[in-house]
Curated annotation (Swiss-Prot):
<keyword id="KW-0539">Nucleus</keyword>
<dbReference type="GO" id="GO:0005819">
    <property type="term" value="C:spindle"/>
</dbReference>
<dbReference type="InterPro" id="IPR023379">
    <property type="entry name" value="BART_dom"/>
</dbReference>
<comment type="similarity">
    <text>Belongs to the ARL2BP family.</text>
</comment>
<comment type="function">
    <text>Plays a role as an effector of the ADP-ribosylation factor-like protein 2, ARL2.</text>
</comment>
<dbReference type="GO" id="GO:0005758">
    <property type="term" value="C:mitochondrial intermembrane space"/>
</dbReference>
<keyword id="KW-0969">Cilium</keyword>
<dbReference type="GO" id="GO:0051457">
    <property type="term" value="P:maintenance of protein location in nucleus"/>
</dbReference>
<keyword id="KW-0966">Cell projection</keyword>
<keyword id="KW-0963">Cytoplasm</keyword>
<dbReference type="Pfam" id="PF11527">
    <property type="entry name" value="ARL2_Bind_BART"/>
</dbReference>
<protein>
    <recommendedName>
        <fullName>ADP-ribosylation factor-like protein 2-binding protein</fullName>
    </recommendedName>
</protein>
<keyword id="KW-0496">Mitochondrion</keyword>
<dbReference type="GO" id="GO:0005813">
    <property type="term" value="C:centrosome"/>
</dbReference>
<keyword id="KW-0206">Cytoskeleton</keyword>
<dbReference type="GO" id="GO:0005634">
    <property type="term" value="C:nucleus"/>
</dbReference>
<dbReference type="GO" id="GO:0005929">
    <property type="term" value="C:cilium"/>
</dbReference>
Length: 156
C-alpha cells in the first residue's frame, strides 16, 4: 500500500481589528479602481500638472494644490467608505496604516501616502506630467529579438 503524505493545514485566525482593516482595504481597492475615482483624480491632475517642476524648490502654489487635493480626493474616498462601512473612522484607519504597511498593495498605499506625504504627492504629479508630455521610458521600444541559431546550417 502506498504511503499517503499527510498535509497539515493551519487556519489563520486574525483579530477583529485585522479583519476590519482588511475589509477597509478591500473596499479601498474597489473605490480606487472605479472609473468615477479615476476620472476625479485624473481631472484634478490634468488641471494642475503644468504647475509642477522637477526641482528641489517647492512653489507656494504646491501647498494650495495639495490642500485642494486632500479636500477633494480624501473626502471622496471617505464618503465612499462611509457608504459601504457606516461605522468607518478615517482617522483610526490612518493611524493603523503604519502597523499594516507591508500588507497593503503598492498602488493603494501610494495613493494613501499622497494624502499625508507632500513629497509623494509631488512625485505623483511629476510622474503624471512626464506621462502627459511623453517623457516616460518605453521599455519595449528598440528591443530586437535575434535568433541564436544560424539561419543556414551547412552540411558536411
Amino acid at each position: 500500500m502506498e504511503d499517503l503524505e499527510e498535509e497539515n493545514f493551519s487556519l489563520s485566525v486574525s483579530s477583529p481589528k485585522d479583519a476590519e482593516f482588511d475589509n477597509v482595504v478591500g473596499h479601498l481597492e474597489d473605490i480606487i479602481m472605479d472609473d468615477e475615482f479615476q476620472l476625479l483624480q485624473h481631472g484634478f491632475m490634468d488641471k494642475h500638472y503644468h504647475e509642477f517642476e522637477d526641482t528641489e524648490e517647492n512653489k507656494l502654489t504646491y501647498t494650495t494644490i495639495f490642500n485642494e487635493y486632500i479636500g477633494l480626493v480624501e473626502k471622496y474616498i471617505e464618503e465612499q467608505l462611509l457608504q459601504r462601512i457606516p461605522a468607518f473612522d478615517m482617522s483610526a484607519f490612518t493611524s493603523s496604516l503604519q502597523c499594516h504597511r507591508e500588507e497593503i498593495a503598492g498602488d493603494i498605499f501610494d495613493i494613501l501616502l499622497t494624502f499625508t506625504d507632500f513629497l509623494a504627492f509631488k512625485e505623483m504629479f511629476l510622474d503624471y506630467k512626464a506621462e502627459k508630455e511623453g517623457r516616460t521610458v518605453d521599455l519595449g521600444c528598440g528591443l530586437v529579438v535575434t535568433s541564436l541559431m544560424s539561419s543556414s546550417i551547412s552540411s558536411s
